[in-house]
């Protein structure tokens, strides 16, 4: 059927009649001008894609009527303009695509129908680790090791880029996905197939929201959902509430964008924005650069919103020019946005739209801060850090407690490193990493760090040699301006050499600590510290030996590295003593905003962006030399320990199976609150005594060849064994942290995988019990695929993080939620019961269903299939099964 809104199509420029757009101002509907700008993007996509099948006229009306419909839990479809993937989530996506081609062929269909319809970019940034640091050749050494470890994965991805149309691979060594997206891939306005329309994106990484800072609406989705979008399916989403976040005033001189985002994160966690859009407005926005806005948007998952949108304004347009985008295209971008009423003037309050609610922040009230020691939302003012850490030491085990006995608070362990004697104590910094797209995309904080390093070196300050220091920029542009401005050599003198272009320490690829440091930490049971300019600091994520991890701005990372401890009051205690005996305080070396801006104006210029990005796809010689097969169907290598055909589609037929009641399920694990996807499916090192290690050893590998869980996401045998394998897992069945559980029929304590295998062999279904925020953190599809392979049929939790619930749905695992006011405690659940979950034939979205226990007790829970489309996926056994049946029939 033709588009019912064709009457509002017109050329953007009369001189170019072939280039058209849907002119939303021609709707002549007064509601349009009151819509939040983020909702206008959803509306335009619905109008442009309206076909009365996937997108209906009623969907358009529901979005236009947002002010009323936002409270009605109404489902709307959204077709984003692009998909982005990183390699940890991208490899399993390409594995699934290859396996789907095989499945379609087996069912008699055309395998080449499995092909991205929506354009996809895959940026390889998650594989590189900090094996080498504090040496001039660290970058080359780490990149060589990356290729040695990941050659097979990289060959597979190169095959994918050739076998599938519409899929572009950005090679390793190019930068971090979100920074590359911001500086290079993002268009703001698309010019495709004869139409102009707003750029929008979904990505298989939760920090995809970073590009919201440029005015490109985007957010993270599960890998499974992203695959469906690539195959032309719209995202089915509940029309969101939009919280207006009003920024007022100017930041104080010493405050960085990192301080602002950590303040906003804590504030919005308290407001409660899960499942909502946040849209920024107010005169304070005009004080923020695009890099500052992108930093704030990047940490959107940490405050729990779906998107954190900054509408496009003249500063956004200026950023496109600054980053070397084509000037003619930039002019068209501005002209289009003006025509459709999507160009914002933050100083003009008459443009302020309607919001669900409005909250405010005066930027002048923000003070320098960090977040930690275990969660991004736990903000601590720098002036309070010493006192806060010392309180955490003795506090009860929890997000703000380590339960260290008072008589051990001042324990000191002596150790030798490279022939010199040193001491470690609670609070000693052992990792200091300038890392992560959150901050390395921001010239003001990166140049601030460089200028602070210069002043520190000139004052005679140093960093202790055992501290693992590193600098992993999000793109080559950063190195370019640090070098050109003359600060790179000072960073190197403090140990902050460039170690790679990728996520690195921020995702746990921090590499090993020196043996003597690990021995000292272990001997003293010390709460050692990592300080990083990252976006997440969940327990066990950054490094197994840093129990406390603080998020901080790049200049503060260097300051704490010089101090060597977080038990310092920077206002009263010096960082060190100069050669002349003078006490040097942090305020003595902290650069002013004027100093930073002067350097930024001189050295961050369009030419450097053009130079770096024009050769991004061809500059990596090792990638160019990779040999990849050219077949359209992948030839699986049975000896491979990286790439394996997954069992998800084994035995799939065209006929649907009726979902059955889950009978007498055992509880595999019993969790409390805030179990993250890092707990469920860790990305870091494979422990030598783990089920995954035993499997890899049986395949002839040595521990040096294990690599990380993240790198092995193309192999289901490793990933199933790595499910719930986090060493910091807290399972209520077990009285200590670790990846174990009780196998109830035998009463034995086993590794989680081994227990699940025993249940499976006996034919027993499994469920998981959890508290609030189950599945928080990274958009990790293996956190749903892994439990599915272990035989988990359902999860019963108090609440879910959005992306993880969607991933469970995508795998056909039932997300159940306690009724309001109920939880495991109020219902008296111990997890030792057996659970029968009644699945009625007439399922409806968010239906209350009955659960019977073997004790005779009965209660109800909400089945969190939120839309009719999600129910369709469930009836098919998951979203990918649905797509295969659709393509094969």
Swiss-Prot record:
| Residues binding substrate, per UniProt | 86, 205-207, 536, 541, 699, 779-780
Gene3D superfamilies linked: 6.10.190.10, Aconitase, domain 3, Aconitase, domain 4
Top EC class for this record: lyase
> GO terms for biological process?
citrate metabolic process; intracellular iron ion homeostasis; tricarboxylic acid cycle
What does the record give as the reaction this protein catalyses?
citrate = D-threo-isocitrate
Mind listing the UniProt keywords for this protein, alphabetically? Answer: 4Fe-4S, Cytoplasm, Iron, Iron-sulfur, Lyase, Metal-binding, RNA-binding, Tricarboxylic acid cycle
List its EC numbers. Answer: 4.2.1.3
One Pfam annotation reads Aconitase
Alphabetical list of InterPro entries matching this protein:
AcnA_IRP_Swivel, Acnase/IPM_dHydase_lsu_aba_1/3, Acoase/IPM_deHydtase_lsu_aba, Aconitase/3IPM_dehydase_swvl, Aconitase/IRP2, Aconitase_4Fe-4S_BS, Aconitase_4Fe-4S_dom, AconitaseA/IPMdHydase_ssu_swvl
The record's annotation in PROSITE patterns points to: ACONITASE_1 (PS00450), ACONITASE_2 (PS01244)
Q: Predominant location of this chain?
A: cytoplasm
Q: Which family does it belong to?
A: Belongs to the aconitase/IPM isomerase family.
Q: What does this gene product do?
A: Bifunctional iron sensor that switches between 2 activities depending on iron availability. Iron deprivation, promotes its mRNA binding activity through which it regulates the expression of genes involved in iron uptake, sequestration and utilization. Binds to iron-responsive elements (IRES) in the untranslated region of target mRNAs preventing for instance the translation of ferritin and aminolevulinic acid synthase and stabilizing the transferrin receptor mRNA. Conversely, when cellular iron levels are high, binds a 4Fe-4S cluster which precludes RNA binding activity and promotes the aconitase activity, the isomerization of citrate to isocitrate via cis-aconitate.
Query: Which NCBIfam families does this chain map to?
Result: aconitase_1, PRK09277.1, PRK12881.1
Q: What's the protein name?
A: Cytoplasmic aconitate hydratase
Gene coding for it: ACO1
């Amino acid at each position: 059927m033709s588009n019912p809104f064709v009457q509002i199509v017109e050329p953007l420029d009369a001189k170019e009649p072939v280039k058209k757009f849907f002119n939303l101002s021609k709707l002549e509907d007064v509601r349009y001008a009151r819509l939040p700008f983020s909702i206008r993007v959803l509306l335009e996509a619905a109008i442009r894609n309206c076909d009365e099948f996937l997108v209906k006229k009623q969907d358009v009306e529901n979005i236009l009527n947002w002010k009323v419909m936002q409270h009605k839990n109404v489902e709307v479809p959204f077709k984003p303009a692009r998909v982005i993937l990183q390699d940890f989530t991208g490899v399993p996506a390409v594995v699934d695509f290859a396996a789907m081609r095989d499945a379609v062929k087996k069912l008699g269909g055309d395998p080449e129908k499995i092909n991205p319809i929506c354009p996809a970019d895959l940026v390889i940034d998650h594989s590189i680790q900090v094996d080498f640091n504090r040496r001039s050749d660290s970058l080359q050494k780490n990149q060589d090791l990356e290729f040695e470890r990941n050659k097979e994965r990289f060959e597979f991805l190169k095959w994918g880029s050739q076998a599938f149309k519409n899929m572009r691979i950005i090679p390793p060594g190019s930068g971090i996905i979100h920074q590359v997206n911001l500086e290079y891939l993002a268009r703001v306005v698309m010019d495709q197939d004869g139409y102009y329309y707003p750029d929008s994106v979904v990505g298989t990484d939760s920090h995809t929201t970073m590009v919201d800072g440029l005015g490109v609406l985007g957010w993270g989705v599960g890998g499974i959902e992203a695959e469906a979008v690539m195959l032309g399916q719209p995202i089915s989403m509940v029309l969101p509430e939009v919280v207006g976040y009003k920024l007022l005033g100017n930041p104080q001189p010493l405050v960085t964008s990192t301080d602002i985002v950590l303040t906003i994160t804590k504030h919005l966690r308290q407001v409660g924005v899960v499942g909502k859009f946040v849209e920024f407005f107010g005169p304070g926005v005009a004080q923020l650069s695009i890099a500052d806005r992108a930093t704030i948007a990047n940490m959107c998952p940490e405050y729990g919103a779906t998107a954190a949108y900054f509408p496009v304004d003249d500063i956004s347009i200026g950023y496109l020019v600054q980053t070397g985008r084509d000037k003619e295209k930039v002019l068209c971008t501005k002209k289009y946005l003006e025509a459709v009423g999507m160009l914002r003037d933050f100083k003009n309050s008459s443009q302020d739209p309607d919001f669900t609610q409005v909250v405010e922040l005066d930027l002048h009230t923000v003070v320098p801060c960090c977040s930690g020691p275990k969660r991004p939302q736990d903000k601590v003012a720098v002036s309070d850090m010493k006192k806060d850490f010392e309180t955490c030491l003795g506090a009860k085990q929890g997000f703000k407690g380590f339960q260290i006995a008072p008589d051990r608070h001042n324990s000191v362990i002596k150790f030798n490193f490279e022939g010199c004697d040193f001491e470690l104590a609670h609070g000693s910094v052992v990792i200091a990493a300038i890392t992560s797209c959150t901050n390395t995309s921001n010239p003001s904080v990166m140049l601030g760090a460089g200028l602070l390093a210069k002043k520190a070196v000139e004052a005679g300050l140093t960093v202790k040699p055992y501290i693992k220091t590193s600098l992993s920029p999000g793109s080559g542009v950063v190195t370019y301006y640090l070098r050109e401005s003359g600060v790179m050599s000072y960073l190197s003198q403090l140990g902050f050499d460039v170690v790679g272009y990728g996520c690195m320490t921020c995702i746990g690829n921090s590499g090993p600590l020196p043996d003597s440091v690990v021995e000292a930490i272990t001997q003293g049971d010390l709460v050692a510290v990592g300080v990083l300019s990252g976006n997440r600091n969940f327990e066990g994520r950054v490094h197994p030996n840093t129990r406390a991890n603080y998020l901080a701005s790049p200049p503060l990372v260097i300051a704490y590295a010089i101090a060597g401890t977080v038990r310092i009051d920077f206002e009263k205690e010096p960082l060190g003593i100069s050669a002349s005996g003078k006490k040097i305080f942090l305020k003595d070396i902290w650069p002013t905003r004027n100093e930073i801006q002067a350097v930024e104006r001189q050295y961050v210029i369009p030419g450097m962006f053009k130079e770096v990005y024009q050769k991004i796809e061809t500059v990596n010689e090792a990638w160019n030399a990779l040999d990849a097969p050219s077949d359209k169907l992948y030839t699986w290598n049975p000896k491979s320990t990286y790439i394996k055909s997954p069992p998800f589609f084994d035995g799939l037929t065209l006929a649907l199976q009726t979902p059955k009641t889950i009978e007498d399920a055992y509880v595999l694990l019993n969790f409390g609150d805030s179990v993250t996807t890092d707990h469920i499916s860790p990305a870091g090192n494979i422990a030598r005594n783990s089920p995954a290690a035993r499997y890899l050893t049986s395949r002839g590998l040595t521990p040096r060849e294990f690599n990380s869980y993240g790198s092995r996401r193309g192999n289901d045998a490793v990933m199933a064994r790595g499910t719930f394998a986090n060493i910091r897992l807290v399972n209520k069945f077990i009285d200590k942290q670790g990846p174990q559980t009780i196998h109830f029929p035998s009463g034995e304590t086993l590794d989680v995988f081994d227990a699940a295998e025993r249940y499976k062999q006996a034919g027993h279904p499994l469920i998981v019990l959890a508290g609030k925020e189950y599945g928080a953190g990274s958009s990790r599809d293996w956190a749903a695929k892994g439990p599915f392979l272990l035989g988990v049929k359902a999860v019963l939790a108090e609440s879910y993080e959005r992306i993880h619930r969607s991933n469970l749905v995508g795998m056909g695992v039932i997300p159940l939620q306690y009724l309001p006011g109920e939880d495991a405690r109020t219902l008296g659940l111990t997890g030792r019961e057996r659970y029968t979950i009644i699945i009625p034939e007439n399922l409806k979205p968010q239906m209350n269903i009955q659960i019977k226990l073997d004790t005779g007790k009965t209660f109800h829970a909400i089945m969190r299939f939120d839309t009719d489309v999600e129910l369709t996926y469930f009836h098919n056994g998951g979203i990918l099964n649905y797509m295969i049946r659709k393509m094969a029939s």
